Design a protein with these regions (language model features):
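Active-site-lining helix/loop region of Rossmann-like oxidoreductase modules
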Residues: 6, 140-204
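Short acidic-hydrophobic, aromatic-tinged amphipathic segments that line or gate anion-handling sites
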Residues: 47-53, 166-169
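Short beta-strand and adjoining strand-loop segment in the mid-core
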Residues: 96-97, 106, 130-151, 155
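Rossmann-fold NAD(P)-binding glycine/threonine-rich loop
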Residues: 91-134
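Short, structured coil segments at secondary-structure junctions
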Residues: 43-46, 82-83, 111-112, 160-161
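NAD(P)+-binding Rossmann beta1-loop-alpha1 motif at the extreme N-terminus of oxidoreductases
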Residues: 1-40
């Protein structure tokens, strides 16, 4: 599968490396020819390449967005309509929001008409690199109205090492999933528990 990564910071970079190890072709969208972070990722794995953002979005099967949320509306408008393409929104509009929307998910869904899912936003990038904790793994959580996009997110989460993926619900639950992400940020960073922590659902 060809996966476009838009936003190759900590989260995007971690998932790019993880999915490349699973055999996917990763194309990192860049705005400039000389991009040190992108070049470092390319050097780490032969299945990671770079190309201009518009090109990678047009040619990829799935697009992961891990940018600051406030640029989502402009990105979506620049891409136009993308019927049938899967977009995974890994942003969190907690302190800043996209122009005209509460979340990046809603901007992408409304403007591009793509198959959109919220995922990979509720834990730190360290867990994107390795979600293993002893003999168990961190859980992943998804939300959105597209079953096609959810199925893709489940598949990619499993391949990244997340054994269990829980469905938070439809597009009306996306903001709740961002609040859930803030719970991780609060515990890990603000309350000093450390970034090597994750959420796990326990059942009796």
């Amino acid at each position: 599968m060809k996966i476009a990564i838009i936003g190759h910071g900590n989260v995007g970079g971690a998932l790019a490396k993880n999915w490349a190890k699973s055999g996917h072709n990763i194309i990192i969208g860049t705005r400039k020819a000389q991009d040190e972070k992108a070049a470092q990722l390319v050097a780490e794995h032969e299945l990671i390449k770079t190309a201009p953002i518009q090109e990678v979005v047009a040619t990829a099967d799935t697009v992961l967005v891990a940018t600051p949320p406030q640029v989502a509306t402009a990105l979506a408008r620049s891409w136009g309509t993308l019927p049938g393409k899967v977009i995974i929104d890994a942003t969190n509009a907690i302190w800043q929001q996209p122009e005209g929307y509460d979340t990046a998910y809603h901007a992408f869904a409304d403007i591009t008409k793509a198959e959109v899912v919220k995922a990979f936003n509720t834990t730190g990038f360290e867990n994107m690199e390795n979600p293993q904790y002893g003999d168990t793994t961190a859980d992943m959580f998804i939300a959105g109205d597209s079953e096609t996009a959810k199925e893709m997110a489940r598949k990619l989460a499993n391949e990244a090492g997340f054994e269990r993926v829980y469905d938070f619900g439809g597009g009306d639950k996306v903001k709740a999933l961002e609040h859930f992400a803030f719970a991780w940020i609060n515990l890990a960073i603000m309350q000093g528990e450390g970034r090597n922590m994750a959420f796990k659902v326990l059942k009796k």
